[in-house]
């Protein structure tokens, strides 16, 4: 997420900053529609080639949106009983994916030791400390699978029999993978126009 968000923040007209608290059930649908029509994103909407990653709070509000009516149907579930599905998972052909692991949903990270959001640092000239902008939680991240590709760099599988490792007495299976994400320009004018990010206004200040 952070790699695509960083690229979107470099583009005019393809990023915004909105306080999460300003989203309401009355305006959430309109805000999402405005994002999906930003710049040249309509081209990708028409092709059915956009995915929107949305945080849980906004998904909850969209479910309660006052901009449209909904029909809730009950369905039989395999274990018996009745289930209902109320989540909105598509707008005009754009798939909406709820990001449950919100600790990963920031616009930048410090990868020095694992991955942690960048903490806001205030300038302190007497101690020669430069100011640093903290990470922002992502509200909505939009991308096209036509131009955003995740490429594996390393993909290794290891299998150890009992006695061949020090992690216990059983068999040990290890799967190690490392990937990177690239955002490619379109094939018409060599510009990036298939991504968009909206972030919260609050900077990360540490736990």
Which positions does each model-derived feature cover?
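Structured, hydrophobic secondary-structure cores that serve as assembly/anchoring elements
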Residues: 25-75
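Sequence/fold signature of self-assembling virion shell proteins
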Residues: 1-30, 64-207
